[in-house]
Amino acid sequence: SNERLKWESENDCNKIFEEWILDNKLSSKKKIENIRKEISNYVKEEKKLAWELYQRPIKEAKDDLISVFSKLEGLDVDIKKIFSTIDDTNISDIVKLCRRFIYDLPANDKKNKEILNNWKKKYSDILSDKYSSNLYSIDISKLSEKFILPNYLNDSDEVDGRIIIRDNFDKLLESNSRIFIFGEDVGVIGDVNQGLEGLQEKHGKERVFDTGIREATIVGQGIGMAMRGLRPIAEIQYLDYILYALQILSDDLATLTYRTLGGQKAPLIVRTRGHRLEGIWHSGSPLGGMLSFLRGIFILTPRNMTQAAGFYNSLLNLDQPAIVIEPLNGYRTKEKLPTNLGKFKTPIGKVEILKTGNDITLVSYGSTLNIVYEAAKKLKDYSIDCEVIDVQSLIPFDLEKDIVKSIIKTNRLVIVDEDVPGGGSSYILQELLKKQDIYQYLDSEPTLLTAKDHRPPYGSDGDYISKPSVEDVFEKVYSVMYESDPRKFKEI
C-alpha cells in the first residue's frame, strides 16, 4: 500500500543511520555524499566486470564452435544463420545448437560427426564439472578405504549385539576427542537399547548427552558441529522418526558440498535404528523415500551390530555425511565380541556374499538378511542352490559390481526388501539394470519381494503378514525355479 511504502521510506535504515551520524557529528554531509558516489561507482564497475567474466567462457565456446564449423569437410555452413536460431547467453545454448546440428548430418558423414561429438563432449563435461559435481564429499567411484576385518579369539565370548556397539563407541570416544554422541535418551540411560550404557558417566555430559525430542534440531546441531571440525554422531531414535528431520537432511546436509562446489563439508553421522520389530511406529523401513530425497548422504544398512560398528569406524576416516541404520532386532542377538573394537572397518560400497550358490541370486539388506538366509538353507533341501548377497551399502551401491558377477553365474535374481513396493527394491533393480547391465544375463524375469503397502501393525501376526517371511522368500524363489524347469520342480 502507499501507506506502507511511505513508512518504508521514512524508516529506511540507511537514511536513519545517516541522520544519526550527522546528529552525533561523526561526519559531514559532504563526506557522506562522496562515500555514496564512490560506492555507486564501485558497484557499477564490479557489475560490469562480473558480466564480462561470466560472458568470457560463453564467447570462448562460441568462437570454438565457429572454428569447428569452418573446418567441417564437404559442408557449406552458414554460421550467421545457425547462430541466429539460438539465444547464445549460456554455454548450454551453444551445446544445444551443436547437438541439433549433428541430428541433420548424413548417416555416413562419420568424420564430421566425430569432430562435432568431440566438441560436444568437451563442453558438456565443462558444464557437468561446474553444475553436476561434488554431490559427495569424496569421489565414490574411487572409494578405496581399506577395510579391516574384525579379529576374534578361538574362545571369543558371544555377547548381545548392543555390547559390541557400546564397547566400540567407548573405544572411539577414548581415541578421538572430537567425537560427540547425542540425541533423545542418549545420555543418562545410554539410549533406548543400551548401546551407550554408562558412556556419559565415563566420558562426561559434554561428550555424550541428551537432547530434546525434535529431530530437526538434533540434525541441525550435528550439521553445525560437523562444519566446525568436530565429528558428531547424532541419534534419531527410530528410523520412523527420520521423517521429522527429512527437510533439513535433504535441503541442508545432502546439498551442502554440492551447492558450495566442494567448498564446505559437514561429515555428520546420523545414527538410527529400524526395520522389522513389532509396532507401527517402530518397524519402519522407508528406504525408497530416503534414497530419493537424500542423494549426497551415504545410506548404510548393516545386518548386525558388528557390521554397524565397522561402518562407524570407517566413516570417521572420511569427510562424508552418512546415515547408519542399525537393525532393531539385533541388540539382543548374540554375536562374537571382536578383539579390535574401534579399529576394524566395514567396507563402504561393497556387497558381501553370505552364501555361495549356482541356481539363483538372492539380494537383500538389513534385518531381512536373516530371513533370506534361513530360507536359502531350507531351499537347499529342495535342490535349489541359492547365492545370498548382503548389499549392506545402498549409497554408494556395489561399486565393484559383484552382483552382476553372481547373476552371470546363476542367471536368476530375486530382490527381497521390507520397504513398500516400489521402494528400496526398485532402487536396487534400477542400479543393477542401468549400471551393471544384468538384463542380458537373465534367463528369468527379475523378481521383487517386498513388504505390503501399509505400515506393519503391532504384534507377531501383523509382522508376519506385512513383511517378507521365510515362507514368502521360499515360495517366491521356488516359483522362479519352477517356471524355469517345471519338469524338475513340482508345483507347490
Model features per residue range: what roles?
Residues S1-P321, I325, L328-I492, ...:
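Thiamine diphosphate
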